[in-house]
């Protein structure tokens, strides 16, 4: 019996997060034993160049010595206290120092907790129940955000998972990404308390918002008294040191973070303006809590990560250069082989679509050739290149990847392209 079959005997589906099961690309997932730099190694000794990097957090690659040292030092003092620690204060100061429009922060344990809590605060402060989210944007698996599109952009959301009561999602309105008119329709009922969006969508591969769209969205929220939430769990510290703020310069009322902010440990956070955040308990009436929130080991990893990023701001140009080289190579090889492909790069994030037109929203993304992606994934994995096991996920570059790694990836794609 293989390890995956054995895992299925004890763990639901053999995995603890569905995408890891390789259902959308076929085959069995490699079980990873260790990571080092830009590479991961499975239990059979196979080596893979890792373009997932734990879905984004590992911007310095696996087993970075500075982060490893910070974690070991923290563990030696105790793994959890359930009490305040100075490292929480240090990390909070480092984060808020980057964002002049954010005054206070609250640490949690995951991106899902961050977005769920941000929406609770926004509803509590605005006094309105309805929220607007966008098709194709994923904000974690909390009930009110697990919705799919109805018959139109302004319809009430319908649950996209059994176990989510319709009453939970009836206050979730769906709009189309990069389509401001669909947002205006959602505002017509007068009961919208907040809007949540990935300003750089990383859960329909990579689709950045158009600046004009985000600018108008900011104006609409201000005009209608709705709180604007930027979900930067993925793009935070990845699109740039200050995430989407470096790309667009647009100020959200609340920003959620995750992934990079924890240095690879389970951490989430949400930060906002004082007038909003001071409504959280224990200062205000809106309740939010967590036994392991602000865990000293996770905070130490995040602090080491952020200090290293802030001391090397030039690294983002290098990361983006590598990502652009990879995507340009994919475009050239695809063209040589008559393959339709579209690519996007923002900072150290990249995405590509087997599609004849550049996707602007989820409808466009759904026109991509997912069967071709599945074959691409399988063939590249055989050759030692670990891309996301889903056409709807973003890829990531880390600092320890070099031109030789990129060239090897392009050579492998050149080899398989004629058969795709």
Swiss-Prot record:
One Gene Ontology MF term: glutamate-1-semialdehyde 2,1-aminomutase activity
PTM sites of type N6-(pyridoxal phosphate)lysine: 259
Pfam family, one: Aminotran_3
Cofactors (names): pyridoxal 5'-phosphate
GO process annotations (BP): protoporphyrinogen IX biosynthetic process
UniProt KW keywords: Cytoplasm, Isomerase, Porphyrin biosynthesis, Pyridoxal phosphate
Catalyzed reactions per annotation: (S)-4-amino-5-oxopentanoate = 5-aminolevulinate
Annotated Gene Ontology cellular component terms: cytoplasm
Cytoplasm is among the record's keywords: yes
Subcellular location: Cytoplasm
Xref: Gene3D superfamilies: Aspartate Aminotransferase, domain 1 (3.90.1150.10), Type I PLP-dependent aspartate aminotransferase-like (Major domain) (3.40.640.10)
Subunit structure: Homodimer.
Similarity annotation: Belongs to the class-III pyridoxal-phosphate-dependent aminotransferase family. HemL subfamily.
The protein's name in its UniProt record: Glutamate-1-semialdehyde 2,1-aminomutase
Organism: Nautilia profundicola (strain ATCC BAA-1463 / DSM 18972 / AmH)
Gene from which this protein is expressed: hemL
